[in-house]
Amino acid sequence: VVEVLEINKEKIAKRAGEPIEVKYVLDLREFPGTPIENKIVHDYKVIAEDPEIGIVVETMGGVEPAFTFVKAMLEAGKQVATSNKNLVAAKGAELIKVARDHGVNFQFEASVGGGIPIIRPLNKCLTADEIEEITGILNGTTNYMLTKMTEEGADFDEVLKDAQDKGYAEKDPTADIEGHDPCRKIAILTSLVAGQQVDFEDIHCEGITKITPEDIKYAKAMHRAIKLLASSRKVGDSYTCLVAPYMIDDTHPLSGVNGVFNGVFLRGNVLGDAMFYGSGAGT
């Protein structure tokens, strides 16, 4: 975040109407010899109680202590932006209410879809539409792995190690390969269109650990691609959500989303079909 604010300093200042300066960085560690060494603080209350601070960006990850910190910032009248999907999936509705009660914004565009701007279109541009379906490739790590298995005939363990070596997969890849990561993301997107909190723990979730090279061969023979999809469909007055590997026809827009890229396919009763595409893992 600090790097982006520095690289695009002039452009950001022009769009904001004034310079955006980083005053504090909250961390347990010290960073001697770096540009932020004099900005490090270890107590979040220093930030919450400083009247000069108008915007807080949370990049900690996890639900706690992020929830405690973010709630305190909103209650102190700070605008908050986060990329923390775990926090938004678990506490998003509560934090949105806290923000509304205190006349500030809780923004979470970066929590879903990597480099794809999907939250704002759903929240702002498509509010008059009845969104009937959201289907997405929402995890760049597993999409990279499935692409490698498809293109090179590699097995699961081999492509997982490759993804870890490249920094796409964590040392503990459970959240990615078991589908927990896209499950949280589809819960967030469904919450937006449903107008109420959708609990990710209620969504059936299956990852890619059982996919074999033989499965890939069968899919290719049928002109299909295996993708880990997170989907949400409107059924009557409710929504049905699912995360699982699918075999999709090679004419489907998502079949061409490969490597670390993400894609989100929307269907609205007025909009019709729309596709959002952009970088996933590593962004």
Predicted stretch roles:
Residues 40-42, 58, 81-83, 89, ...:
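General beta-strand structural signal in soluble alpha/beta enzymes
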Residues 158-256, 261-263:
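Substrate-binding/catalytic subdomain of NAD(P)-dependent oxidoreductase enzymes
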Residues 1-76:
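N-terminal glycine-/serine-/threonine-rich beta1-alpha1-beta2 phosphate-ribose binding loop
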Residues 251-283:
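ATP-dependent carboxylate/acyl-activation modules
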Residues 61-63, 139, 248:
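Short glycine-rich anion-binding loops that position phosphate/pyrophosphate groups of nucleotides
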Residues 53, 100-181, 188:
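Rossmann-like NAD(P)H-binding beta-loop-alpha module
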Residues 60, 65-76, 83-124:
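Rossmann-fold NAD(P)-binding glycine/threonine-rich loop
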